[in-house]
């Protein structure tokens, strides 16, 4: 079977769900803080799921199994987001204030706004990255949601120093397809990792602020 000619039912379901994301849900009108958090968490969960399934399908389609372990341990696995002091897990996140976590989340989201528009140019399989425009829209929706939360919680007297804005723009989109594929192998992996961080931060904030007994992170 030719690479990219089949996809798992879960991946197809994720893409379908993404395309059906209602436009009216993309806005963040005035609403209770609990609803703002709930909406932001749902958007982050959806994007993380989409990123994880995209990475699986990309790896299954393009990367021979014997190369996967070596590639994951190479420089290609480095993520630019590692250059900012963002928490790496739930325990670390719980040591940060809500505003700090929102600022980290915003930087992570904004670091992807440009590169997601290039994904379909880097990788040849349009079924894997052909929805990059929709992913960009969802990132913008989540960015707006995080900014709305920051406006609600903002305490200007406790603002920290500006964060270094990481970038994924250095990934090369001008190489031949095979070369670009290997050079940029870490891109979908980093996207998945960064969205997982954002989802974790938002869940930590929502759980400790509203004390949900059934909260899972």
Curated annotation (Swiss-Prot):
The keyword Plastid does not apply. Residues 1-26 form the signal peptide. SUPFAM superfamilies: 4-helical cytokines. It comes from the Eukaryota. Zn(2+) binds at residues 46, 199. GO terms for biological process: animal organ development; growth hormone receptor signaling pathway; negative regulation of apoptotic process; negative regulation of gene expression; oviduct epithelium development; positive regulation of gene expression; positive regulation of growth; positive regulation of receptor signaling pathway via JAK-STAT. Disulfide bonds join 79-190, 207-215. It is found in: Secreted. One of its GO terms (cellular component) is extracellular space. Keywords: Disulfide bond, Hormone, Metal-binding, Secreted, Signal, Zinc. CDD domains: somatotropin_like. GO terms for molecular function: growth factor activity; growth hormone receptor binding; hormone activity; metal ion binding; receptor ligand activity. Growth hormone plays an important role in growth control. PANTHER family: SOMATOTROPIN (PTHR11417:SF2), SOMATOTROPIN,PROLACTIN (PTHR11417). Belongs to the somatotropin/prolactin family. This is Somatotropin. It comes from Struthio camelus (Common ostrich).
């Amino acid at each position: 079977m030719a690479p990219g000619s089949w996809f798992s039912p879960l991946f197809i379901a994720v893409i379908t769900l993404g395309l059906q994301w209602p436009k009216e849900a993309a806005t963040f009108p005035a609403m209770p803080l609990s609803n703002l958090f709930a909406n932001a968490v749902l958007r982050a969960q959806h994007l993380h799921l989409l990123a994880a399934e995209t990475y699986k399908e990309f790896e299954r389609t393009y990367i021979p199994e014997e190369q996967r372990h070596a590639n994951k341990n190479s420089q290609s696995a480095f993520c630019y987001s590692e250059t900012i002091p963002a928490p790496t897990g739930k325990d670390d996140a719980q040591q940060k204030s809500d505003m700090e976590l929102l600022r980290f989340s915003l930087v992570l989201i904004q670091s992807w706004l440009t590169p997601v528009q290039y994904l379909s140019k880097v990788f040849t399989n349009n079924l894997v990255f052909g929805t990059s425009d929709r992913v960009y829209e969802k990132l913008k929706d989540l960015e707006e949601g995080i900014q709305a939360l920051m406006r609600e919680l903002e305490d200007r007297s406790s603002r920290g120093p500006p964060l270094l804005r990481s970038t994924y723009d250095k990934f090369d989109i001008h190489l031949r397809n095979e070369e670009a594929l290997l050079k940029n192998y870490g891109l979908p992996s980093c996207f998945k990792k960064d969205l997982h961080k954002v989802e974790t931060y938002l869940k930590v904030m929502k759980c400790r602020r509203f004390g949900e007994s059934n909260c899972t992170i």
